[in-house]
Every structure is written in C-alpha cells, then in structure tokens.
C-alpha cells in the first residue's frame, strides 16, 4: 500500500493523455458546450471524462486543425515543440469582484498549467492554483459547516485556512500521465477528478469533490469501451484524526469502479456501472487495500456478500440516445439498495435507495448556430449513498455524485449562446430538499450522506423531502469575451441570485460582478 501511495504522490504534478485527448477535464461545462457539437457529429464518446481518444483529433488544443502543427498563439503562453516532444505553459487566473446591497466579495486565484507530449503514446498535464476568497454569505456558511471544529472545506477545492477577517486561503493541484500501451488499452494515473454522464449533473460520479489519487484503465474492444477506476479518498466527516499503529491523519477509504459502455448503433449508447467503497482497515498485519476488489472483470455485489456485506456498493445505468444530428436524450439510474417486494407495497421503505436523471440537449437550437439548450431533472431518494460506517459515497466532506447529497429533486434549464469569441450563458436551478437538522446529529432524514443511516427516523413511511422541506432557487447569467483560446482566458460580467425558503428561514442573495478567468474548471456553487 505504501508503494501504491508513493506512486500516486510522485505524479501529483503531472498529467497524461493518450494519442490525443481532448482536454475535456480542463473545460468547464460552459467551454465544453463549444466543442460538444463537433464531438457528437464525430460520434466520439463523451460519457467518461476526461476523454481519451485513439486518434489525433483536431480538437486537441496543441494542434492546428489543418496541419497538426502547434497553434501559433503566444499570448501569455510559452510553447516549445520538437518532433517527439513538446509542451506549453499557460497562466491560470480567476480574478473576480462582486457586490450586493450591503457587501462586496472577491476571488484571487493564480496558477500555472503545463501540458505536453512525449512521442505519440505519452501526454501529460499538470496545474497548480493558489487562492484567496471572500464568499457570499450562503457559500461562506457552506464552507464553514463541516461539523468538525476548525475544519473548513471549500466545495471542490479542499481545506481552507482563515484569511484576514472573513476570507479563506486554499490551494489545489492536479495532474496525470497517460500512456497508450496499444490501440485498445490505455493506462492513466495521477491526481484529479472524473465525471460520468452527458449532463450538467452526474448521479454516478462527478467532479464536485476535491481531487484524489487514481489509477484508470481503459479498454476499447469494438463497440465496447470498458473503464476500471481505482481511487483513494479521505474521510474527514465521520472519522477525525486517527492515531492507530503509528498512523496519524485523516481516515482513508478506497473505491473500485467498473464502467462498461456499449455503442449499440450510431444513435444509442448504453453504459453499466458498479462501484464499491470500503473503509481503511487498521488491523495489524492487514493491508488497507482489499485485493478482492482489484479484479478488473468481476461483479462487486457477489464479492461484497461473500465478505459479509461490510462495504458500500452501487450499481446503475447510463443512457444516451441521439434523436437527430444535434439533439440527444440522456438518462441515469442508480441503485444503492433495493427490495422489489417493498417497492410494490408502496410503503416508503427506507432501504429502497435509488436515484435517476433525465435530460435533453438541443445543439444549435431552432437552427440558430451556437445556441445550445439543456433541460435536466434529477431525483435521489433519502439515504442513498449513505452507509453505517465511513464508507459513504463521499470524499473530503463532499458528495461524490450530486452536490445536494440525497433526499432531493432538481430541475435545471441551461441556455448557452456562442458567437465568435463572445458568449452568453444562462442557468436556472430549482431544487426541493429534505434537509437534516444541523442542531441534532442523533437523527438522519436522509439528506446528509455522511450521517449513519442507522440514525434514520423510521424504517417505513420515508417520503421524499422528509426532514426540513426546503426550496432552493439559483439563477446565473454571464456575458463574456474569449481573450485566449489556448487556456480559455475570458473577461466577463455576471449576475447571481440564490433564494432559500423553509419553515425555519427565508433568505435571498443577489449580486453582480466582473471577472478575468481561465474558464477550465467547474465550480458547483449552485446548491
């Protein structure tokens, strides 16, 4: 296990990609919308991100679409290229200032991005960001609410330190190396995030959390694409600093995930996934990494049962149907635990834990080139993703799937318009959530996935939105100009609004501001 961790640590600042990867992981949802039409028209798989291709693709930022030469754009970027080696170093920025009726907020993020290739089999990527932020009130509360004294977590960006009066100082680094063994098998390892799905949210695995060490294997066999993902997570909610057998630090847990996708025809792609999360074992002489879950081709449920069912297993389906050239439907279904007889009885059995997503995208909506629309609905039953020990489906105090955890439904509308270097982006979210009582940790209503599900309010009559029924509305509007395509540097103005209403509180926050940022990452503050 120490060797396993050491390998991950050595490559924290590097990244790699195969013969040619569209750097989808370094595109925000906004920027990815600009290239999604090209990907769909090329019939390229976009479900498991970051994407891995086995052919040099014109979307790769290192290459010109006509002659595969390096893009001649040296604005704020440093390029170097030889026949079998090349790299680019680009600055990373996220500078913003916003105000509301009473206060002002700001973000100051600076960093560097390194990308390159060695031959035609190896590519690498790495970045580092240093940040100081003053957040709006609702987000400030989210950062401070971890139920661990003195521990503050910025969503998706890790642990923060106090900065001046009410600000936060935090840093983040990611990187990975990708090696193509042959045309059918690729190995990728490093420190980063993943996203499974074709929508704005994912109920399977999203880039909502802080980054983590991982090993990824991807196998392509005809119409099948098979991915194995092995990760290491930190549990900082249920287990504080553990000092056992000379080990001190946050408790760790591990995930093994299989995702098998089949391209049935040019229109239909269906994927089946299974994952298992298991806690670290501190018993003397016992390896923390359970070799039972390293077999790349087994099903985890039989193995879990053979071990006495101590771990947290999920299964599910991802579906994408191209209804026309520029339109497609997508859906996800996840099952945590499920009893058919209890479902038929319609008695609200607590262990019928599942979730589903239904979405629709129309690229070049109404034949307006550059106008993309996205409608999406998500629902997750209470207690889904949770467990009785630290094996909940989360990392660094953040859910691995949807930011709201469980016991919610959500409706999303997105409109994005791109014209040359200009863009307009609009997003509307409405979520209804059954919140847990933050003042009472002895009972769980199924929203907080880190609470022990044995603290449930009852075994039956568990309805949606059980707990503190809360309505949350988020609105976002951006007008931006793309300064540099190489690192997606843009300047823009924005408006944000968030409303929360329940029986205990009623809040409405609205603010507007300006920014200069490299729009490469997703920040899920709409929660």
What residue ranges belong to the model's regions?
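Outer-membrane beta-barrel channel domains
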Residues: 22-269, 274-280, 345-354, 361-387, ...
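Short, charged, low-hydrophobicity "junction" segments
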Residues: 9-10, 61-67, 461-465
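Bacterial Sec-dependent N-terminal signal peptides
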Residues: 1-24
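Short regulatory "switch" loops immediately downstream of catalytic or recognition motifs
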Residues: 1, 10-12, 233-236, 431-434
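Exposed, low-structure sequence patches enriched in small/polar residues
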Residues: 170, 263, 268-527
